[in-house]
From Swiss-Prot:
This is Tetraacyldisaccharide 4'-kinase. It is an enzyme of class 2 (transferase). ATP binds at T63, V64, G65, G66, A67, G68, K69, T70. Transmembrane segments: none annotated. The gene is lpxK. Belongs to the LpxK family. Pathway: Glycolipid biosynthesis; lipid IV(A) biosynthesis; lipid IV(A) from (3R)-3-hydroxytetradecanoyl-[acyl-carrier-protein] and UDP-N-acetyl-alpha-D-glucosamine: step 6/6. GO terms for cellular component: plasma membrane. Disulfide bonds: none annotated. It catalyses: a lipid A disaccharide + ATP = a lipid IVA + ADP + H(+). It comes from Hahella chejuensis (strain KCTC 2396).
Length: 338
């Protein structure tokens, strides 16, 4: 099924023409939803008045599937921490299920409750992370519990109830906007013209067909043992054959990274946010098992003997951070004037 969807959205399959009428219906529903929300919002209060709450940056995308939002969120959090600011993060928590919300991500988080991406963000940065299906509720809890200077939403571009002061869209340079159609005929959650109203577009990788303000490169760091504290250099597995496990939006990107590192991979792709059982990553051989950091947060409890994850970091030009900082300074200036 996944392969068929890939062909329709990113290949030349003619199924898109049969699905096109459903895309128009989808667009109609989106338009009605936005109109109704605008009416409701005019008479409702949002989580924290813009004049008193910290600036909110939404990092999202227009397409379904992985584009590189979470690495960019981590990079922004680390940037603000280096500046001495106190950032906080809100997230939907895809892949996690809790009896009650909002959920505060704490020490040794359970990805089955918080979701894999919030757990990863907290484990990498240590900053406050709050999860709720309704991100506005997560925001309110974050503001009630922490004195944050800036809030970042991991995804949420289409979550209309979430206030925002800056929108950053991430696009996978390899996939772009697919066939340019909205769901279900294409991968778009909103038409490409939505980019006209966002602040910044960041391309994850280089591609001539993607027009972006800035380019982000995901740089491999070190291999770290999934169940333990051991580390190895980025080229440690060069020349090896290994099982490659990935439950991310675009597993092909991870597999391509392994090929660049001269690793011959036996590929095992799972749906995004897949909840692993230990048997999923136990193979009848002695080959190492390699995975992404997002997968590793869900596998730490398995006590795997020879499983490793690749830590990656988002590398961006300093001009990107200068643009973000300038926007925050502008917001603070307006707040003082108000």
């Amino acid at each position: 099924m996944i392969a068929w969807v890939e062909r329709v959205w990113y290949g030349g399959s003619r199924w898109k023409f049969l699905l096109w009428p459903l895309s128009w219906l989808y667009l109609l529903v989106v338009a009605i939803r936005k109109t109704l929300f605008a009416v409701i919002k005019s008479s409702a209060s949002e989580a924290g008045s813009a004049s008193i709450r910290p600036p909110i940056i939404v990092v999202g995308n227009l397409t379904v599937g992985g584009a590189g939002k979470t690495p960019l969120v981590v990079a922004l959090v680390e940037h603000f921490q280096r500046r001495g600011l106190r950032p906080g993060v809100v997230s939907r928590g895809y892949g996690g299920v809790s009896e009650s919300y909002p959920v505060l991500v704490e020490r040794n988080p359970d990805p089955g409750v918080t979701g894999d991406e919030p757990a990863l963000i907290y484990m990498r940065t240590g900053c406050p992370v709050v999860v709720a299906p309704k991100r506005a509720q997560a925001l309110q809890t974050l503001l009630d519990m922490y004195d944050c200077d800036v809030v970042i939403s991991d995804d949420g571009l289409q979550h209309l109830a979430l206030p925002r002061d800056m929108e950053v869209v991430v696009v996978d340079a390899q996939r772009g906007w697919g066939n340019g159609l909205c769901l279900p005929a294409g991968p778009l959650r909103e038409p490409v013209r939505r980019l006209q109203s966002v602040d910044l577009v960041v391309s994850n990788g280089l591609h001539a067909q993607v027009n972006a303000d800035y380019t982000m490169q995901l740089r491999p760091g070190r291999w770290k043992k999934v169940s333990g504290d051991e580390e190895r250099g980025v080229n440690y597995f060069a020349g090896y054959t290994a099982h490659a496990v990935a439950a991310i939006g675009n597993p092909g990107r991870f597999f391509a990274t392994l090929a660049d590192l001269d690793v011959a991979s036996i590929q095992h792709a799972f749906p995004d946010h897949y909840s692993y059982a230990q048997k999923d990553i136990e193979f009848n051989d002695d080959l190492p098992v390699l995975m992404t950091e997002k997968d590793a947060v869900k596998c730490k409890s398995f006590n795997l003997e020879n499983a490793w994850y690749l830590e990656v970091g988002a590398e961006l030009n300093s001009a990107f951070y200068e643009r973000v900082d300038a926007r925050l300074n502008e917001l603070r200036s307006h707040k003082k004037d108000g």
